[in-house]
Amino acid sequence: MGKMKAVEVRAPGGPLQLVERDVPEPAAGQVLIDVRACGICHSDVFTREGLWPGLAFPRVPGHEVVGVIAAVGPGVHEWRPGQRVGVGWHGGHCGRCEPCRRGDFILCRRGLVPGLSYDGGYAERMLAPVEALAQIPDPLSDLEAAPLLCAGITTFNALRNSGARAGEVVAILGIGGLGHLGVQFAAKMGFETVAIARGQDKEPLAKQLGARHYIDSSAQNMAEALTALGGAKLILATVTSGKAMSAALGGLGIDGKLIMVGVSEEPVEVPIAPFIMGRRSVQGWPSGTSMDSQDTLAFSALTGIRPMIEEFPLERAEEAYHRMLSGAARFRVVLKTA
């Protein structure tokens, strides 16, 4: 048994500490991954602060994991050493609960999440169950693929399951870590893409990402601007402000929908009568399965979609985490482990 470097949290609220651990061996139905890159996601706060039910310490965070299979456990026949794989938020499912029996694995009542249910990707090696694995296409580098396994799949999956059709007005509220990918996906899917953010200085970036229209929410009324475009079939809310989401609702067209993928502690206030009379709705969307991740990666490779990233070595995980948490990192932060 060899040794590996890992970054762990030993107690709720504790620092990220670089340690040496024994390399684990894969059990039945598992693979051992040589981790090449792991994205840092805001949801890693759940691990750092001990906010997940049943979370055991010490724990290695990380659920945007890219690497190469180093070994397979007993009974694993579909995967082989040397394959490039990714593991996202969907880290396994039971296959027995009602959502699983209906094929809705992301809502498994006993679902597993890397970095929460078991040790994640802030490490040189990691174990994962085979149902959590996604194939990674060659055109994507390790660093590019990592954020697509959470921020990417969440926005891609929400858009493709929204009911919006090519040519319809789709607005992306916020163009940060999630939103800058959402704008790219929406444009490549053929929607009349509208990017909404604060400040006129963000318009060049929005247009570069593929937006046809830009709304400066600090200077314009979002609802009025969207209505002038005919009303949005979909508003994908990637921001963490319930007030901003509420302010955008008036810009929905008939049968329009607001899908929330950004988490806010503020409530979203819905004007009931206009929603009834216009058949409008509000919905949440929670990531997706490993096959959804694989679809996201394939679509990104095919269409040239790439995340904008900042790279840090594993040894600087604490610094990288705080850069993400403080908002100093504009888009996505990725740890390079190999």
Over which residues does each language-model region extend?
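C-terminal hydrophobic helical "lid"/dimerization subdomain
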Residues: 1-4, 246, 290-338
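Short N-terminal strand-loop motif that marks the start
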Residues: 1-66, 128, 336-338
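Glycine-rich beta-strand-centered segment in the early N-terminal region that forms part
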Residues: 24-38, 51-98, 135-143
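NAD(P)H dinucleotide-binding glycine-rich loop of Rossmann-like/cofactor-binding domains
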Residues: 78, 92-173
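Adenosine-nucleotide cofactor-binding segment
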Residues: 169-175, 187-247
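N-terminal Rossmann-fold NAD(P) dinucleotide-binding loop
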Residues: 179-180
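Helix-to-beta-strand junctions that scaffold the AdoMet/dcAdoMet cofactor pocket
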Residues: 252-253
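Rossmann-fold dehydrogenase core element
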Residues: 257-259, 270-310
